[in-house]
């Protein structure tokens, strides 16, 4: 293949880079393969709908294979099948709270009923009365309502008491309990540090009472992210130091407020607390102590990292300045993640609907309990695996399209000497080039990520299934393999992004672009460490700033609630949303910095500033590199070594 051929490598070393000049289609076989794969995904969707799965999914069916709300045909050798359920439109489970999370099934008999019980039914007499008044029989079809109170008849064929109040799920005709206590054990499994139901209820009530504050803080994080993007565009030279100071103040402020609240709570007289509230007060004090210690540890670690990186922080200023100019000329880049997210949501909605259709597709089969399940037999049973691979590959393909679009727009900006000659819409021009020439390259790059991601997910599933059963050696090996595959996936993702940039520059196929990008990154190893990594770290500080600011605002707004234990869920929700919003905005800035760095490295490798070989880069960036090289030479021997790495690699003539 071209990825590893020595002849190809020799041609690459002699090949001239001609940015944006020659454009040709790349990796056409991979585009054809991807199109065929998508046709297969469409076949799975059509098959699942055409085989009647849509009616079983939407209307629901009972444990005997009868679809609710219609007349059914008799199934061979299956009792209670072939019933007329025209007036029984809802699925009712005799024990709706008995869920099997491992096998993703409801371990309960399902019946078609005329109405869901809107009030709790505590006795069999209540169940009988409900059937007589509403005409909705909640026991098995073989038992008459008059026989509900007979223990010998109703045992195992009537709902588990008490029957929780339920309501039909919109559009899906299933009776679902309206009381969340039915699912309390699953919430407790997620919140493992809580063993007292009263604490769990206080946490949930804290979220409900603070929903307006949570919504306001989420909007605040969105506004702060947009403000930070504006600051990055217009004051990039001082942005690094502003971020550093604000992060220090934000982390110190949040930590100080938590310790102040802890001291205030500890000094409060316990005699004034009624005995019933004493345990709650102790929980509050313990929660505040945990919050304060966690914030202190985070602040100390953050300070140590900033102390180590302080000498190299200045290296990012010039690169941030150029990136700010990119957003001035290409402001719509900020909204690129929203279009990508919208495309992902549409695909995921399609994928989930098809998955639900597949779950009710196939022939009726009687299981060990005598109930009906729908299973696909023969080669079609492997459609599940095909569908899962499609989820990963197409999702990675959509993300790769975003990377190629951003790379194409930034490359156009960088290699256009006169910025007044930029296309009217560089982003749309980049999308046009992607669709016309480079969809095959994107398909190949996303497939490589899929090849690494699938084994890692399989190992993670095996590890979760064997939890508590495997020995220490096997557990260590599994975790090591998962960790190695995760690292490989991250490295390949970074290489893929740079390969897309190389393709956007010179219109080469994926293998050639990946090889060229890898060689350039290796030749500029210290540049990658000193500029690219530090830039990413400063963007991370921007995310931390938004999270800390939003969290601090949340602490001040939630301070009126003296039950500090209930802070945990609202603060976690707000901080997670703030981080996701900040990541959504700043990830594009990070991507622009990465693309600019590769363009800069290629520019310095193939141009020397002489007539006919002028640099494309911004003068500010080149002046910064030269000044840094001189400063490092004056610093001594070690600095001279770094300077040799930082100076432009002039091409020998």
Curated annotation (Swiss-Prot):
TM spans (from-to): 30-50, 212-232, 238-258, 288-308, 315-335, 338-358, 380-400, 537-557, 566-586
List this protein's GO terms for biological process.
choline transport; ethanolamine transport; transmembrane transport
Q: Which stretches are Mitochondrial intermembrane in the membrane topology? A: 51-211, 259-287, 336-337, 401-536, 587-653
| Lipidation sites (N-myristoyl glycine) | 2
Localization: Cell membrane; Mitochondrion outer membrane
Sorted alphabetically, the Gene Ontology cellular component annotations on this record are: membrane; mitochondrial outer membrane; plasma membrane
- Which keywords are on file for this protein? Antiport, Cell membrane, Lipoprotein, Membrane, Mitochondrion, Mitochondrion outer membrane, Myristate, Phosphoprotein, Transmembrane, Transmembrane helix, Transport
Q: Is Glycosyltransferase among this UniProt entry's keywords? A: no
For molecular function, the Gene Ontology terms on record are: antiporter activity; choline transmembrane transporter activity; ethanolamine transmembrane transporter activity
Reactions catalysed, semicolon-separated, are: choline(out) + n H(+)(in) = choline(in) + n H(+)(out); ethanolamine(out) + n H(+)(in) = ethanolamine(in) + n H(+)(out)
- Topology in membrane: Multi-pass membrane protein
Q: Does the keyword Transport apply?
A: yes
Q: Which residues lie on this side of the membrane: Cytoplasmic?
A: 2-29, 233-237, 309-314, 359-379, 558-565
Which superkingdom heads the taxonomic lineage of this protein's source?
Eukaryota
| One matching Pfam family | Choline_transpo
Entry comment describing in which tissues the protein is expressed:
Specifically abundant in skeletal muscle (at protein level).
General function of this protein: Choline/H+ antiporter. Also acts as a high-affinity ethanolamine/H+ antiporter, regulating the supply of extracellular ethanolamine (Etn) for the CDP-Etn pathway, redistribute intracellular Etn and balance the CDP-Cho and CDP-Etn arms of the Kennedy pathway. Involved in membrane synthesis and myelin production.
Regarding protein family, the annotation reads: Belongs to the CTL (choline transporter-like) family.
Please state what the protein is called.
Choline transporter-like protein 1
Give the source species: Mus musculus
């Amino acid at each position: 293949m071209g990825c590893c051929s020595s002849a190809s490598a020799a041609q690459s070393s002699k090949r001239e880079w001609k940015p944006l000049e020659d454009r040709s289609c790349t990796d056409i076989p991979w585009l054809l393969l991807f199109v065929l794969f998508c046709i297969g995904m469409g076949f799975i969707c059509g098959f699942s709908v055409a085989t009647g799965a849509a009616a079983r999914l939407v209307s629901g069916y009972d444990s005997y294979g009868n679809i609710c709300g219609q007349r059914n045909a008799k199934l061979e050798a299956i009792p209670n099948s072939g019933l007329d359920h025209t007036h029984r439109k809802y699925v009712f489970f005799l024990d709706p709270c008995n869920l099997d999370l491992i096998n993703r099934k409801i371990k309960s008999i399902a019946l078609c009923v005329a109405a869901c019980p809107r009030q709790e039914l505590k006795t069999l007499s209540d169940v009988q009365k409900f059937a007589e008044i509403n005409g909705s029989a909640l026991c098995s079809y073989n038992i008459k309502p008059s026989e509900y109170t007979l223990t010998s008849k109703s045992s195992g064929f009537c709902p588990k008491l008490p029957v929780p109040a339920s309501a039909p799920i919109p559009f899906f005709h299933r009776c679902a309990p309206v009381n969340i206590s039915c699912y309390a054990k699953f919430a407790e499994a997620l919140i493992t540090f809580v063993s007292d139901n009263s604490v769990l209820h206080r946490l949930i009530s804290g979220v409900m009472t603070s929903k307006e504050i949570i919504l306001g803080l989420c909007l605040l994080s969105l506004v702060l992210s947009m403000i930070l993007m504006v600051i990055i565009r217009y004051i990039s030279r001082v942005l690094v130091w502003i971020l550093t100071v604000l992060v220090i103040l934000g982390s110190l402020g949040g930590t100080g407020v938590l310790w102040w609240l802890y001291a205030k709570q500890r000094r409060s007289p316990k005699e004034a607390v009624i005995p019933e509230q004493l345990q709650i007060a102790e929980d509050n004090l313990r929660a505040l102590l945990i919050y304060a210690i966690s914030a202190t540890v985070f602040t100390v670690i953050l300070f140590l990292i900033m102390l180590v990186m302080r000498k190299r922080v200045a290296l990012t200023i010039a690169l941030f300045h150029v990136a700010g100019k990119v957003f001035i000329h290409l402001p719509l880049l900020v909204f690129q993640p929203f279009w990508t997210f919208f495309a992902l949501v549409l695909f995921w909605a399609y994928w989930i609907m098809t998955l639900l259709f597949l779950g009710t597709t196939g022939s009726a089969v009687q299981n060990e309990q005598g109930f009906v399940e729908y299973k696909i037999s023969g080669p079609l049973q492997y459609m599940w695996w095909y569908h899962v691979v499609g989820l990963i590959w197409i999702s990675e393909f959509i993300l790769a399209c975003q990377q190629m679009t951003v790379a194409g727009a930034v490359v156009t900006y960088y290699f256009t000497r006169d910025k007044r000659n930029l296309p009217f819409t560089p982003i749309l021009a980049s999308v046009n080039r992607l669709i016309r020439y480079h969809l095959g390259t994107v398909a190949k790059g996303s497939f490589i990520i899929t090849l690494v991601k699938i084994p890692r997910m399989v190992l993670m599933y095996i590890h979760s299934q064997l939890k508590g059963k495997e020995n220490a050696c096997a557990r260590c090996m599994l975790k090591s393999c998962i960790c190695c595959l995760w690292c490989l996936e991250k490295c390949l993702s970074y290489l893929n992004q740079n390969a897309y940039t190389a393709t956007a520059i010179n219109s080469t196929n994926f293998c050639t672009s990946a090889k060229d990008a890898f060689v350039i990154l290796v030749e500029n190893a210290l540049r990658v460490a000193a500029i690219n990594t530090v830039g990413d770290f400063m963007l991370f500080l921007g995310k931390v700033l938004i999270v800390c600011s939003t969290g601090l605002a949340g602490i001040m707004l939630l301070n009126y609630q003296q039950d500090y234990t209930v802070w945990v869920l609202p603060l976690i929700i707000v901080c997670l949303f703030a981080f996701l919003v900040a990541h959504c905005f700043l990830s594009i800035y990070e991507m622009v910095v990465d693309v600019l760095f590769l363009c800069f490295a290629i520019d310095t490798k193939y141009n020397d500033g002489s007539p006919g070989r002028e640099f494309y880069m911004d003068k500010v960036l080149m002046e910064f590199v030269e000044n840094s090289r001189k400063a490092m030479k004056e610093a001594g021997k070690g600095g001279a070594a770094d300077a040799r790495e930082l100076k432009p690699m002039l091409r020998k003539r």
